[in-house]
Amino acid sequence: MNWEEAIVRVLSEERGPLHYVEITQRIISKGYYEPRGVTPENSVGMYLRRNPNLFERVSKGVYKLIE
């Protein structure tokens, strides 16, 4: 599983918006993806911002899955 797949899975399970730090914590705690870098939150935030066709920003740092 890659970052994008892990983000989609977490947001699908939640069925609502989450802050990108919370998304990252859930990905790591559930073992969906093993981060390689020092700042996995930044990686998740980048994926969310760069994929507006998949993720909608609802407030600062908070995103939901576009269905």
Segments the model singles out, each with a brief description of its role:
Residues 1-9, 14, 18-21, 27-67:
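Charged low-complexity interaction tracts in eukaryotic proteins
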